[in-house]
Amino acid sequence: AAAAVAAAAKAAAAMASSGVGVGDDRDGLLRVSGDGLELTSSAANAWAGGRAALGVSGGGCYHFELLQLSPGICRAGWSGLAAKLALGTDRQGFGFGGTGKKSFGNSFDSYGEPYGEGDILGVSLDYRDGSISYHKNGVPLGVAFTVPPPLLRQPLFPAVSLKGCSVRLNLAGPFAAAPAGALPP
């Protein structure tokens, strides 16, 4: 347990990097730090979502990470500008939640394994093959989604939905684990 706490503290220090985080594209229940990288749900029983201010498009692979700072449920992934902020509840956003479920189009399917406080979640979008995949504490969980081609023709944004927890985003690197050649969003 002490090693996990030390690793989480080291990861939090590494994630203190600058970068463009979440701005105004968020629910009223989502509190955002001054640098836009620390996000907190202000309600224990309601989802609060937000999208990063900058998206990605075109070829290549993009990756971001988050450290879950407190108990609660986090869902992280990628979304288009037209997506609901409740990530994965429409056909414009893709999420993977701490309950071990991936979501797209309001369909929740088992994937990977649960995660929570102290875990680092890596989130990758590869435009070369249209895939979204995840890492938990540096361990690849495999491909979660194949993005429909029409969505690959628009910018996609790092996105989170939180219920009763806080996370720290790392949108600039260095990353704990990322696919070879992955770039920050």
Where are the language model's segments positioned?
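PRY/SPRY (B30.2) beta-sandwich protein-interaction domains
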Residues: A1-P185
